């Protein structure tokens, strides 16, 4: 079993670029089309580690889906981000949905 560092609904930062994101899904290993030779995913060690579907915001505040290796992410210690409140809301909404009981009728 592969353990992941980050969880769904958790806020993270890109370790190189510093942008804030929210984890929306996790793959136990790289699962997209075979990478090009110049892509980060071409590294076999990175491909066999967890990969994360992360929502970030572009310069216009629009959501952008990214796919990042665990090695590219760091923990985010701050809970509130006044400059990007929609990412705070997304993270809170996902965490709430994961904690809410599922009702079956």
UniProtKB/Swiss-Prot annotation:
Look up the record and give one Gene Ontology term from the biological process aspect: response to heat
**Subcellular location field:** Cytoplasm
Instruction: Give yes or no: UniProt keyword 4Fe-4S.
Output: no
Tell me the InterPro entries matching this sequence.
Hemimethylated_DNA-bd_dom (IPR011722), Hemimethylated_DNA-bd_sf (IPR036623), HspQ (IPR022866)
* Gene3D superfamilies named in the record: Hemimethylated DNA-binding domain
Domain of life from the UniProt record:
Bacteria
For this UniProt record, give its keywords in alphabetical order, as a comma-separated list: Cytoplasm, Stress response
Q: Which GO terms describe its cellular component?
A: cytoplasm
Query: Region Disordered: what ranges?
Result: 80-105
First and last residue of the signal peptide: none
Any idea what job this protein has?
Involved in the degradation of certain denaturated proteins, including DnaA, during heat shock stress.
**Which NCBIfam families does the entry link to?**
PRK14129.1 (NF010729), yccV (TIGR02097)
Protein name as catalogued: Heat shock protein HspQ
Q: Which organism is it from?
A: Yersinia pestis
The organism that produces this protein has a lineage beginning with: Bacteria, Pseudomonadati, Pseudomonadota, Gammaproteobacteria, Enterobacterales
Gene designation per UniProt? hspQ
């Amino acid at each position: 079993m592969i353990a992941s560092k980050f969880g769904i609904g958790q806020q993270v930062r890109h370790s190189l670029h510093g942008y804030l994101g929210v984890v929306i899904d996790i793959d136990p290993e790289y699962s997209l089309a075979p990478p090009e030779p110049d892509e980060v995913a071409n590294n076999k060690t990175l491909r066999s580690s967890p990969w994360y579907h992360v929502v970030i915001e572009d310069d216009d505040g629009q959501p952008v889906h990214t796919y990042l290796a665990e090695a590219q992410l760091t923990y985010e210690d701050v809970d509130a981000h006044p400059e990007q409140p929609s990412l705070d809301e997304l993270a809170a909404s996902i965490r709430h949905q994961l904690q809410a009981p599922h009702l079956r009728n």
